[in-house]
């Protein structure tokens, strides 16, 4: 099965896993997904993730989802820039997600980072997704 948008598939897996109260979900491997998972871990939205492999060529991530008092920590996670309509912004025009309570994950020339770090570094880029 070919995926036209693996990032959207990854975000949907997280959303569905949290709605069904799963402790662990399995998502496909890519460098972009790895970078997004590192940001989600550093910001406290997930408990952790590990890289696994079925064979030498098939890799995937096991993601430990985080809950607080029985409720999912991630209340909203959405794809912003889509394959059919890309969304770019400069560092000075970068919006804040829920007035700074949430975060945007941005693909910049210096790598994938949160909106706060992109503003701090003075770089803009493609807004991949928003997390609240």
Curated annotation (Swiss-Prot):
Claim: Ribosomal protein is one of the keywords in the record: yes
GO cellular component: ribonucleoprotein complex; ribosome
Pfam families found in the cross-reference section: Ribosomal_S8
PROSITE patterns hit by this protein: RIBOSOMAL_S8
Keywords assigned: Ribonucleoprotein, Ribosomal protein, RNA-binding, rRNA-binding
One Gene Ontology term of the molecular function aspect: structural constituent of ribosome
One GO BP annotation of this record: translation
Job of this protein: One of the primary rRNA binding proteins, it binds directly to 16S rRNA central domain where it helps coordinate assembly of the platform of the 30S subunit.
NCBIfam families xrefs: PRK00136.1 (NF001109)
Matching PANTHER family: 40S RIBOSOMAL PROTEIN S15A
Protein name: Small ribosomal subunit protein uS8
Organism: Ehrlichia canis (strain Jake)
């Amino acid at each position: 099965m070919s995926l036209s948008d693996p990032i959207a598939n990854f975000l949907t897996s997280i959303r569905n896993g949290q709605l069904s109260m799963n402790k662990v979900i399995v998502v496909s491997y890519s460098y972009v997904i790895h970078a997004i998972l590192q940001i989600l871990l550093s910001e406290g939205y997930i408990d952790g993730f590990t890289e696994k492999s079925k064979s030498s060529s098939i890799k995937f991530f096991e993601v430990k989802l985080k809950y607080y008092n029985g409720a999912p920590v991630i209340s909203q996670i959405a794809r912003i820039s889509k394959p059919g309509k890309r969304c770019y912004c400069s560092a000075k025009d970068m919006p804040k997600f829920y007035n700074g309570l949430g975060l945007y994950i941005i693909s910049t020339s210096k790598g994938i980072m949160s909106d706060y770090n992109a503003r701090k570094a003075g770089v803009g880029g493609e807004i991949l997704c928003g997390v609240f």
